[in-house]
Amino acid sequence: MITSILLSLALMLFVGMYKTTFYEIKRAQNEIESRKSFWLAEGGVECAIAQYFPSQKLPASIQVCDDTLSVTTKLWLDGTSNDVIASAKSENQSVSRRFALATSELKSGAIQTSASIKIKSSLVINTPDPGIEVDEGWECAAFRFKGHLSVKGSLINYGLSDGPAPNEEFMSHKKCLQEHLTTVAGDCSSSSEPKCFANDFVQDDQLSVFEDFFGVPRHQHDVVRANGMFREINLETQTAEGLWERKDCGEEILQQLRQNNLHLWINGSCVISDDYLADIKALSEASDGITLLVHEGIFAMQGAASIKGVLFHFNQDFEPSIEQWQRLGMGDSIAAHFPEDQAVAAYYQDGSFMITGGAFFDYSNAEHLALFRDSLSFQYNHDVITHSSSSASSYLWKKGAWRDF
């Protein structure tokens, strides 16, 4: 009798354990199937994203990446937020991701650099960035810099009274505040005591030129380069024999501008000789403004240059050297005019320079230098800068939309 009772209890316990185990197995299988559906839906989202980037144009229809899988994929523009939404559904699992348009948050300043600038000869600001309007006038900004700035020669900021308007819609009759107008006869440096620059020259330790201009962090610059708006130029190519050949930067730029490709991303060191500067000037003035962005290399112009547009020099990892300037035939000129700076020079303007728009220099090392020999004249134009930054706008995934909380 006792044996029967014990056997019955053991059987009941076994059946209970079996049911529990079966339940756990079934639940695990369901969870796996659910996760498989979720992963398939995520794959569908990635399929849609691959068809949206790098052109950043919504396709008329989404091509099926794998017709053996039952995944429904959609890609559309949210009319309220202007976010691009990629979504996919597999069985009962739905996944969606949002991409928001990166916007420029550029600070005031006609010329901006995360490094340092040296100018020999005269500096004329025909039209500064108006900056912030207050009751008494405008807090105008000519230069914004992170490193140091020096001018050997005369310097004058004419303000807003005599030069062209900073944009087409600018109707204000107010002038730059007197404390935002610099006039210097002789040498002036950001380290001078007493202070020789007025408040139109702003030293900014938090300046991040690339991110401020494009709305994209420096380390994600490939998003901007591949956004479909820039025409990319690679100045060094490898032959079938394995040899490296260097293209003429000025010739490549002219070729693209003549094809109406106005926003150029130039990879490698670029020297634009005097032979091309007149044609570049004419083509830029016939447009709403061009963008010349030189990335990871030294940048130089030989001769008098005049450009309507945005000049952008962006070095993230590149380190300039005397040997590199020598290889490009510019070493002797830099050594003659800036003998103490040739090892850290990243940009060199060998002749007078005038720009209508803006100039931006973003270097990883604040000690790297942009050097200007001969006269430098700037006319800030907000419309030209906006044309450049908005043309290069890129979509980035929206924070919180990709498990990046």
What are these regions (language model features)?
Residues 1-39, 43, 49-405:
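Compositional signature of intrinsically disordered, low-complexity segments enriched in polar residues
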